[in-house]
Amino acid sequence: MSFTPTDYNAYDFANRRHIGPSPSEMEEMLRVVGVSSLDQLIEETVPASIRQETPLDWAPLAEHELLARMREVAGKNRVMTSLIGQGYYGTVTPPAIQRNILENPAWYTAYTPYQPEIAQGRLEALLNYQTMVADLTGLPVANASLLDEATAAAEAMTMAERASKSKARAFFVDADCHPQTISVIRTRAEPLGIEVIVGHPAQLVPEDVFGALFQYPGTYGLVRDFTRDIAALHEAKALAVVATDLLALCLLKEPGAMGADIAIGSSQRFGVPMGYGGPHAAFMSCKDDLKRSMPGRLVGVSVDARGNKAYRLALQTREQHIRREKATSNVCTAQALLAVMASFYAVFHGPRGLRAIAERVHLNTVRLATALKEAGARVSPEAFFDTITVEVGVGQAGILAAARHRGINLRKVGRDRVGISLDETTDAGVIARVLDAFGIHEPAPAKVGLGFPEPLLRETGYLSHPVFQMNRAESEMMRYMRRLSDRDLALDRAMIPLGSCTMKLNAAAEMMPITWPEFGTLHPFAPADQAAGYHEAIGDLAQRLCRITGYDAMSMQPNSGAQGEYAGLLTILAYHRARGEAERTICLIPVSAHGTNPASAQMAGMKVVVVKSAPNGDVDLEDFRDKAAAAGDRLAACMITYPSTHGVFEETVREVCRITHEHGGQVYIDGANMNAMVGLVQPGAIGGDVSHLNLHKTFAIPHGGGGPGMGPIGVKAHLAPYLPGHPEVTGPLTGGHDEAADEGPVSAAPYGSASILLISWAYCLMMGGEGLTQATRVAILNANYIAARLRGAYKVLFMGNRGRVAHECILDTRPFAEAGVTVDDIAKRLIDNGFHAPTMSWPVPGTLMVEPTESETKAEIDRFVAALLAIREEIRAVEEGEIAAGDSPLRHAPHTVEDLVADWDRKYPREQGCFPPGSFRVDKYWPPVGRVDNAWGDRNLVCTCPPVESYSIAAQ
């Protein structure tokens, strides 16, 4: 018997691990679709006129090869003790939180909790976060996180403008705010026509402004009471915003006690690594009468169908997916996973633990300041929490270098000062090394007093809710985290077929490096030579993304897709201004566009002109041509999504681009659907001038239950000089282009949430060029397979000229309304089958948009199809009068364990209700609550942890 070696490659990540269907399963699926090969399907789906000719050709790495490469790159970063401060601090991530939250796919693969019945665990964790923020800031309402502190400050400015009764058009910013915050505020204010006045609080003229931002503690350390300044603002009908620090508020008088209207800041130092800039969860809290103006998501308490307490996202009519250009913000992605980590940090330590950490940080700072003063150094300010500034004159460079030689980064302040910010990782050894850098060899004193006046000492309690008072044994913490995760449905349990969301595999090997200290401990403003590994990874990823998209330069700064849109539009406007065409402010946007598009355009100061859709779902070319002509030399841009939001490759995309360019506009191609294009179509080659990429969709960053995300923007060469810059960095921030960007920043850190860029880089490296292209092809196959399987039961709403969809398909459920069955009924019934619902009522009301991605196996897709076919039969029973819609399992869905064991008085069998076709019996997912009453929740708004008795007593 002769030996023949197998040709099976056990290390082929793309085809053996990432892509779901096997080659034999693909053949079966292709037969169902009605084609003989994947090549034929792509030819019938993607117009020949736009297909790219040059393939992506880099070789893939196996998982073990990737991790070796990552170790090599990580070794090029220098792990230092960074005492730079400026909003970023060393912290200790409790291993229990790292292991059970950050590294747990039950938490990091979940989607935004728009379906509350399957998100009760993370909604509770986010409610804990809101309670933590509300308690510490002394304001009654807090949201569930924003992108970063600087963005939160800009959001607070526009919120103050909306809510203030002052007629002024200026906003005052304390000069003691972090420099990156001031820069982001300026970027946001300019297109909105808001004047930004930067100065010291003594220079504030309240009558001249609609609001003011104070930093507490200040960026250079000053702690002062703003009560009088805030009262003066209120006299002038202006609002007060305080940028603050949660750890400092464990000791210091809270902003609410000073009369602040809004508080913002970052929760990074609550157990979240710096990560060279992120991701971290920013927070915002406000007075009760401002809650409807607050941006971002808000978790509230409601009841389910049985009257049991249930959590949900409240007041969603404020958000961009509903209000579009009239939304309070364009925020879509937040930082849910990082907010969850911060909330568990507070649960882990409790109020006494947090105060002990705050005291330790503060008293260490007092010891350091005292030792410096005793040695003759000039130290300021007189009142501080964790940050001091030392006047060093011409010796600045020498002291900074001496500190670096001892493994410590200090902050360069002006030409003659050095800033020092201590944190929870600071010990006596670190203090001794700092003193040594100043030539001081005497130890710091052991016994010291407060470093700020006693009237600034906090008098009120915080975190009194039982969740923050629980037994802090790790066994209890572990079980609490497990209980919450068991309430949720994430990718670790089932397919999440959300259209336009691309819930693909987030592979373990891609995730592992983000927790390594070589990546996690770097400060975003550390000297560049300490981050050589980061720069290599970011630069290589940027170049690969340029090859994928056909663009010439890539900015990695935007922290979300919506922020990428905003940055891209600002880039276009800056380009027009540089050409003397500042009057170009009109943006054409199809009516079917994602809600962030018009919201972003409005934020950029553009006038939105809506373009109709043709009956087949395409952009109405005649209407587009007319409106472009009407705009004429006022046309700034058009924003289109490709493939379209209807899930189709439109044949007319080149013509849309041509018309826009003919009238002097720029083409923004939204990259939300890039998962249908990688390796097949380059947006930069079909007429696009700028696109953002949702790395948390196409490039494998997990959704984290509602963030983090990343939205880098690619541009053609003529736009590269107008990409976002940053006040802390000189030289180019872009990949693929040598020209330095000098526009204002859109986020706090130069490279946004830099640490999670490693995930997308790892994905590109392991997939290889051919694997990325194959992933796109299989994503298109999976969507067409679902469309083919369901076509007889549901109408597939939009298809291309040859009857194909792209990577997603829209199922029309509107005809069922005549029988009283709603799209909500279908979505909730899918929960009984163990599935997250597809995207509901967008881009067409009353429809479901399904996107399976390339990562789902045929077996899982078939289970999903079986569930939808069974639901169709239940609808048919209603249509034919066998059962009323209100009595059907559709209306009573989802079914809970409480339903299963209760007396059964329903007009369908218990078996049908609780174990529908497609559901598991042994491993069945049981939602913890029944259908949530959204209207009740908005009428009875509670956005902090409810009293303990409500946990055992059903809501009245």
From Swiss-Prot:
GO MF annotations in UniProt: glycine binding; glycine dehydrogenase (decarboxylating) activity; pyridoxal phosphate binding
Keyword Transport on entry: no
UniProt KW keywords: Oxidoreductase, Pyridoxal phosphate
HAMAP family: GcvP (MF_00711)
Protein's job: The glycine cleavage system catalyzes the degradation of glycine. The P protein binds the alpha-amino group of glycine through its pyridoxal phosphate cofactor; CO(2) is released and the remaining methylamine moiety is then transferred to the lipoamide cofactor of the H protein.
Classification via NCBIfam families: gcvP, PRK04366.1
Protein name (record): Glycine dehydrogenase (decarboxylating)
Species this protein is from: Cereibacter sphaeroides (strain ATCC 17029 / ATH 2.4.9)
